[in-house]
C-alpha cells in the first residue's frame, strides 16, 4: 500500500499513527489533507535503523558529541530535529532546515519500515488539534471503516515521543 501512494494507520509507541511514503509528494499531500495539517509544520520520519534516514540527514554538520547523544537515545521514543540535506523534500521539513527523525524500538514500526524497505512518515492518527486515536475502532471512526490499518498493539509509552533539537539542544516537546 505504501508503494501506491496510500496513507495507512499503524500502531506506534504511544498511539496510532498515520504514515506514508516520505518520498511521495502525492502521498504526503493525501496525509496532510486527511489531517487538515499545514505543510509548513514538517513531518516526523520513523525508521527501524539509522540507515533508513541517512538520505535525509546532513551528518557532516553533527559533532561527535551530538551523534553520541542521538545514538544513546536510539532506538527509542526520542525524535530528533537534525540538519536536513539540501535535497530533502520540503514537504518533510516544512519551513525548517531540519528534519524530524526517530529510530524506533517499537516492534510494529520496525516491522513496517523493514517490510517497506525505508523510513515512513509518522504523525498522530487524528485531525489536527483533535484527540489522537488509541484503538483501531477510533481510527475507523475518525477516517472511515475502510481506512487501511496495520493491525498491532501500541506500545507502553504514555505520551508522544520527546522532540529534541540536536543543533541547539532545546527540548521542543516534552509531555
From Swiss-Prot:
Role played: Required for the formation of a threonylcarbamoyl group on adenosine at position 37 (t(6)A37) in tRNAs that read codons beginning with adenine. Catalyzes the conversion of L-threonine, HCO(3)(-)/CO(2) and ATP to give threonylcarbamoyl-AMP (TC-AMP) as the acyladenylate intermediate, with the release of diphosphate.
Alphabetical list of PROSITE patterns matching this protein: YRDC (PS51163)
GO CC list: cytoplasm
Any single Pfam family the record assigns to this protein: Sua5_yciO_yrdC
Reactions listed under catalytic activity: L-threonine + hydrogencarbonate + ATP = L-threonylcarbamoyladenylate + diphosphate + H2O
EC number: 2.7.7.87
Organism of origin: Buchnera aphidicola subsp. Acyrthosiphon pisum (strain APS)
Location of the YrdC-like domain: 1-175
Name of the protein in question: Threonylcarbamoyl-AMP synthase
Record keyword Coiled coil present: no
InterPro entries (alphabetical): DHBP_synth_RibB-like_a/b_dom, Sua5-like_dom, TC-AMP_synthase, TC-AMP_synthase_SUA5
Coiled coil: none
Location of this chain's protein in the cell: Cytoplasm
Molecular function as annotated in GO: ATP binding; double-stranded RNA binding; L-threonylcarbamoyladenylate synthase; tRNA binding
Keyword Zinc assigned: no
Keywords recorded for this protein, A-Z: ATP-binding, Cytoplasm, Nucleotide-binding, Nucleotidyltransferase, Transferase, tRNA processing
Entry's family note: Belongs to the SUA5 family. TsaC subfamily.
A Gene Ontology BP annotation from the UniProt entry: regulation of translational fidelity
